[in-house]
Amino acid sequence: DNCDTVYLDTNGLTIKACSDATAGDTGVIDGVTYTVVDEAMLRTMIDNDSILTNKVTSLVTDMSDLFKDNSTFNQNISTWDVSNVTTMIGMFNNAISFNQVIDFWDVSSVTDMSFMFYSATNFNQFIDLWDVSNVTETAAMFEYATAFNQDISSWDVSSVTDMGGMFNNTTAFNQDISSWDVSNVTNMNGMFADTPFNQDLSTWDVSNVIEMGSMFTNNTVFNQDISSWDVSNVTNM
């Protein structure tokens, strides 16, 4: 291939590293110099409050806790290539300033998004384009993400098994997710606790759910008909 170091993806936004690129390599696209980084370099740069908008993350597979407790970070990282990342657990956990466009991220390799936006109290961006079909863990993903109220109805959550606390204390969230395939979910503990959520869930297949403890605790508005739910496997309500 004629790839030099980095290139612009066909989506017109993501900057990717060429297949033979190594950490530290640089390349220029549209007059901007981009640097290929590995996980260790990236974490050090974050610790040093470095500019991250021109970093190429194709070599990174683990972004767990990347911005955890980083109260000031709010840089544009829309060009990041996350197509090789498998875990984003706690990635923006308590990153209270972050609110940037990340809708074009290719998250199709990610399996764990639990606690990803936990207490990310400013985040409220469109992420409906995300391919989450390989994600198995979304526990507490938006817990205490008090601003988040976006349409994520098109998400393919058919691989998810743990949604415990997913929207717990997501105090703005009230979106239609009736079309979600939750047939593989076993844990829904506290899923809509302390939220204003009041949407139709009557068609959800919850037949594999075992844990439903505190699912709607302190949700004072939910009044939907869920009498058709098959809760025969539930051991904790």
Predicted regions and their residues:
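Negatively charged
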Residues: D1-N236
